[in-house]
Amino acid sequence: MLTGCFSSSVDFETGWTTRHIEGTMLDSSGGELGGEAFIIVLEYFSRFVQFSDEQPIYIPRARLVRLQDGGRFRIQFDLRASAIETVFIAPQYRMERFRFQRQMGIGELRYQARMNAESNWREHLILEVSPFLENFILEPRYKLAPTHQLFIGDWLDRERE
């Protein structure tokens, strides 16, 4: 019954509530990515006060996750967060996004992020990747750690050369 809730690239283990997301970042042919690839994680926390006639307001918090050997990743899903969005970034590939809602009965998610090669990487970097990443450096509301901001700035400098 729960398998209908996810795309074919997602597998799961049962549990009380979603606590971890793990998987592998792959290129379009199924090879593992690594090196300069990384993941931006956005966790969404519900606002404490909500009036009955309002839509819920979610406060985002960002962090950066580096890949382990073989392109593997493991992301802790903060128990206070109600949703998490992962944005997979690698040079020469299009950004891949996936959003997970916390669900009762799903303990751990496994996601294979299959990246598609970008034939015009320079244009994609300038028009999509750079503005997306610069937002995390400039916007204090994301509370991205200074070391992660520095990593993003250095990464953007290397890619723009």
Located regions from the model:
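Short, ordered, surface-exposed loop/turn motifs in non-cytosolic proteins
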Residues: 28-55
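Short Pro-Gly-centered beta-turn/loop motif in secreted/extracellular proteins
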Residues: 31, 74-84
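Compositionally biased low-complexity segments at domain edges in trafficked proteins
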Residues: 109-161
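Short, acidic Ser/Thr/Gly-rich low-complexity loop/linker segments typical of extracellular
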Residues: 47-74
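Beta-strand-rich domain onsets/edges
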Residues: 5-20, 24-31, 37-39, 140, ...
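Short proline/glycine- and polar residue-rich coil/turn motifs
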Residues: 66-69, 103-107
